[in-house]
Amino acid sequence: MDSERDAVVERKLGPGDILPQLGQILQANAGFALACIAGLAAINVAAGRVSSGLVSFLPGAIGGVIAHYYLIATALTRLGLRKEGTPNRFWDFWGLLILSGFIALLGLAALIVPGLYLNARWAAAGSVLVSGDSQVGAALDQSWTMSGPSAWAIVATWLLIYVPILLIGMTLAGVLGISTPLLAQSVTQIVWSSAAVISWLMGVAVYSLLRPGTVRLAEIFA
C-alpha cells in the first residue's frame, strides 16, 4: 500500500497526459455531458428572465451540483473506478464543494494564481469522494497529495482549454447581443456550462491518471 502511495506522489503529469484522457472520458460520456450543458444553460437563462440578483443564480447552482455529482459518478463507473453498490455520497459531495470552493474563492480574491493553484490541488477531490474511497477531509487530503507534482500542469491544461472557449463565447455574445439579447444570453450560458462540465470531467481524468492502479480509458475499451 505504501509503495502504491509513493508511486502516485512521484508521478508527474503534463497536458499531454491529461488532454487525451479527458478526450476519451468526454467521448465515453458525450450524451450525458451534452444533456448537462443544455439543461444548465436552459435553467440559467430561464432563471435570469424571471428573477434578478442572487436569487437568479440559485436554480443553476443547485442544478449544477446535482449534474456534477451524477456526471462524475457515471464517468467513474464507466472507468471501473466506482463499484456497483457504492453508497450515495451526494450530501458529502455538496459539503466538499462548499468547503473547497470557499477556500479557493479566498485564494482568487487575494490573487488569481493562488486560487488556480488550490483548484488544481483539489481537482481530483470530488472523484476521490464519489468513488467511495474517502470522507470529505480525506478526499481533499488525498487529492492534494496526488496532484502535488502535477499542479501547474493542471493549471496549464485548464488555460489551454478555457481561454479559447471563453474568447469565442465572449465574441459571439458581443456580436449577437447588439440585435438578439436572448440569443447572446443563451450562448453565454452554453459556454459557461460547457466549461463547467469539462472541468468536472477533467477532475475525473486527473484522478484516473494519478490514483493507485492507474488505468487509461483507451485500455479499458481496447
Model-derived segments and spans:
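Juxtamembrane transition segments at transmembrane-helix termini in multipass membrane proteins
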Residues: 2-10, 59-81, 121-134, 153-222
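Interfacial aromatic "cap" segments that immediately flank transmembrane helices
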Residues: 10-42, 86-106, 120-170
